Design a protein with these regions (language model features):
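Boundary at the C-terminal end of the N-terminal hydrophobic targeting segment
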Residues: 16-19
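Extracytoplasmic/secreted envelope proteins and their assembly/folding machinery
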Residues: 53, 104-108, 112, 133, ...
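A short, structured loop/turn motif at beta-sheet edges
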Residues: 61, 101-102, 143-144
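Sec-dependent N-terminal signal peptides
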Residues: 3-13
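Activation targets extended, charge/polar-rich intrinsically disordered C-terminal tails
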Residues: 123-202
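Loop/turn positions that initiate beta-strands
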Residues: 24-26
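Glycine-rich catalytic cores of cysteine/serine-nucleophile enzymes that process amide/ester linkages
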Residues: 30-97, 119-127
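A structural motif
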Residues: 87-89, 97-116
């Protein structure tokens, strides 16, 4: 029984230590262990070849670490351990860190202003709703207040240029054509940005 207690205590200490290595404003990229039907070439991280489907923002509130993220429930604060467990069940997580951290505090403050907004499952910019990588793109600035991550032309197609059936069906439910080429953002684009260094895979 004593040995079991010591093992549990060590596991807890290791978990806390791992959290302490995460800095304010680090970006948490969730990746899938399988390539789903919604994954296109544009959502793959270049150096790891991992399909990235989500991004969140690490933020410390007191001595507790959270993932600030846009999910189905809207823009919410998720305890880091719950976020980590959720991503682990689907694949894993990459932790990204800005090379230049001079604008981190302002960036996180900007993101917190979106807390409570509804989720945008159509991935359109300039609406009151917001999706995961849009939260990062809108919020992250350098020390001069300039946005770090540009908008890109969104891609919903496979390597052969064919729009994936998943996205055709998804937008058809809303009476829309797939917005191929429209301005937007995605998690892999941010993970691949030269402003970011991937420091850890979990």
């Amino acid at each position: 029984m004593k040995h079991l207690y010591l093992i549990l205590l060590l596991a807890c200490a290791l978990g806390v230590n791992a959290q302490q290595q995460v800095l304010e404003g680090d970006l948490l990229f969730a990746y899938s262990s399988t390539t789903g039907r919604a994954i296109s070439d544009a959502t793959v991280h270049d150096s790891t070849a991992l399909p990235i489907y989500h991004v969140a923002i690490a933020t410390w509130i007191g001595d507790r670490l959270y993932a600030l993220e846009a999910i189905d429930e809207g823009v919410v604060l998720t305890p880091y351990d719950k976020f980590q467990e959720r991503t682990k069940n689907k694949g894993g997580m990459l932790i990204g860190r800005l090379h230049d951290r001079s604008g981190v505090d302002q960036s996180v403050s900007n993101a917190m202003e979106h807390l409570g907004k509804p989720y945008d499952d159509l991935y359109m910019i300039d609406t009151q709703e917001i999706y995961c990588s849009e939260l990062v793109q809108l919020s992250y600035v350098n020390g001069k207040g300039q946005r770090l991550f540009p908008l890109i032309n969104m891609s919903f197609h496979d390597a052969k240029g064919r729009i994936l059936d998943y996205w055709r069906e998804h937008y058809a439910k809303h009476g829309m054509a797939v917005p191929e080429g429209a301005l937007g953002t995605n998690p892999a684009q941010i993970a691949n940005d030269p402003a970011i260094e991937i420091i850890k895979q979990q």
